[in-house]
């Protein structure tokens, strides 16, 4: 069994390309946060404040578009512990599980954005605001665009752009558990020069505020 780091804001999962309108915005310059977008960002940070930890079942369907062109399904558990510990443990052999470590980029919690990124706004459309996050530390990621629902302050989509020309994008939908908004499904696409895949993830059986040993989050 292999621990695979990912951000559930994510899971983390599962990836689908943003709408053409969102891509058009992504080509423009990001504007600084104003009073309205700052208020939305604060709501996003405060979302699910009562949740200290959770565990959930996850089912992952992958369709590789590059060699070896397989379409495996994996099951496992996703774990979260405040403030920013997240991981997925797949119920499969380490060799197979390790192949999907690259599927999920790390997603930092919104409360960490201002420390890690230069945060701006690309625009608002169809009831959603797109934030652009540019890493302050030099690395593989050029920027990350995050689409936030203005009514619920939930993240509807992520889109990473990498310096090597690769992209990772996914849309996600939510379910309500104990008054909290938690990811129920993610659908998306991974596109790197040497690795391409369509990914769908489904989450269920959330258990909130349970005890989780920190060893679960250690790389193995």
Which sequence ranges carry the predicted segments?
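Amphipathic hydrophobic-ligand
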Residues: 38, 68-77, 163-169, 197
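Positively charged n-region of N-terminal signal peptides that target proteins for export
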Residues: 1-6
């Amino acid at each position: 069994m292999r621990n695979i780091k990912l951000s559930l804001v994510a899971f983390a999962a599962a990836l689908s390309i943003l709408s053409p309108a969102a891509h058009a915005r992504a080509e423009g310059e990001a504007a600084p946060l104003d009073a309205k977008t700052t208020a939305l960002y604060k709501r996003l940070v405060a979302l699910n404040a009562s949740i200290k930890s959770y565990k959930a079942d996850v089912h992952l369907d992958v369709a590789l578009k590059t060699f070896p062109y397989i379409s495996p399904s994996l099951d496992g558990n996703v774990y979260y512990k405040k403030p920013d510990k997240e991981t997925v443990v797949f119920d499969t052999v380490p060799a197979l599980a390790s192949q999907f470590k690259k599927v999920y980029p790390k997603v930092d919690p919104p409360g960490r954005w201002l420390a890690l990124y230069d945060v701006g706004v690309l625009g608002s459309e169809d009831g959603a605001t797109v934030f652009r996050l540019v890493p302050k530390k030099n690395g593989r990621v050029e920027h990350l665009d995050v689409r936030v629902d203005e009514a619920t302050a939930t993240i509807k989509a992520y889109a990473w752009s990498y310096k090597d020309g690769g992209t990772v994008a996914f849309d996600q939908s939510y379910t309500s558990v104990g008054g909290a908004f938690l990811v129920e499904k993610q659908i998306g696409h991974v596109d790197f020069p040497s690795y391409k895949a369509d990914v769908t993830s489904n989450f269920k059986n959330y258990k909130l505020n349970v005890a989780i040993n920190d060893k679960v989050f250690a790389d193995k």
